């Protein structure tokens, strides 16, 4: 079995560990402004997912959810960060939920930023996947990279109620798609806080970094 290289990551600050996971076609740098606000009180680890940022990816067939979760575990092990609060935007939030389900001993809390749990309805799932395929073709992405953002099952939706750790939900005021997801989280998760950042859309952690950082500090500080 070929060993996958450890994902590139940034590691700043000291204190309780926050583990940041970005969204599709972003990279660790999207968290810079949030981490600038938090690194005085938290250890902030931010990864580049496979095929994103400084990570070259590993070729077609290597972007599935289980493999990427293994990549995140490898960073956790290398940094010896212990159990973490996972802070995920969009795709990163979905991966954070999956980690909390499959490896609950690694996760002490969830910061879900403009995130969703996937789809239980197969037709909705396929509509999402079609939109990802279209975007991948428009961007001329490396073969197979789109798989990282596609949904093949309803695992997270079906098992979300197993998650016991506290979650804080953060969404931009104009992010209507993921505002609906925030309602789903309140139904199934132990939501300790919900923050709507004014005048922000899906990239709320970039456009509204102070509000995102304040919500994370209030929930996990």
Spans of features found by a protein language model:
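Active-site loop/oxyanion-hole signature of alpha/beta-hydrolase fold enzymes
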Residues: 7-12, 36, 45-85, 214
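Short beta-strand/loop motif that positions the catalytic acidic residue
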Residues: 163, 169-171
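Hydrophobic, aromatic-rich cap/lid helix
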Residues: 133-158, 173-174, 192
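Catalytic histidine-centered segment of alpha/beta-hydrolase-like enzymes
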Residues: 200-209
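Active-site glycine-rich loops that stabilize anionic/oxyanionic intermediates
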Residues: 15, 23-26, 90
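Flexible "cap/lid" loop of the alpha/beta hydrolase fold
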Residues: 94-102, 107-136
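Serine-hydrolase catalytic-loop signature spanning alpha/beta hydrolases and amidase-signature enzymes
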Residues: 23-33, 44
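Conserved alpha/beta-hydrolase "acid-adjacent" motif
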Residues: 176-181
């Amino acid at each position: 079995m070929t060993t996958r290289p450890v994902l590139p990551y940034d590691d700043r600050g000291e204190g309780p560990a926050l583990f940041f996971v970005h969204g599709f076609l972003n990279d660790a740098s999207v968290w810079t402004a949030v981490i600038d606000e938090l690194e005085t009180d938290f250890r902030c680890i931010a990864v580049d997912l496979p095929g994103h940022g400084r990570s070259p990816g590993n070729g077609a067939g290597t972007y599935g959810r289980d493999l990427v979760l293994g990549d995140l575990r490898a960073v956790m092990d290398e940094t010896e960060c212990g159990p973490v609060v996972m802070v995920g935007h969009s795709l990163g939030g979905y991966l954070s939920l999956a980690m909390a389900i499959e490896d609950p001993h690694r996760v002490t809390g969830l910061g879900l930023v403009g995130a969703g749990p996937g789809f239980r309805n197969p037709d909705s799932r396929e509509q999402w996947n079609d939109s990802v395929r279209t975007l991948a073709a428009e961007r001329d992405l490396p073969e197979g990279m789109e798989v990282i953002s596609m949904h093949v099952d309803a695992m997270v939706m079906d098992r979300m109620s197993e998650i016991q750790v506290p979650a804080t939900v953060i969404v931009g005021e104009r992010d209507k798609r993921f505002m609906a997801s925030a309602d789903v989280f309140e139904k199934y998760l132990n939501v300790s806080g919900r923050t709507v950042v004014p005048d922000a859309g899906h990239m709320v952690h970039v456009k509204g970094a102070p509000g995102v950082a304040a919500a994370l500090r209030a929930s996990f500080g």
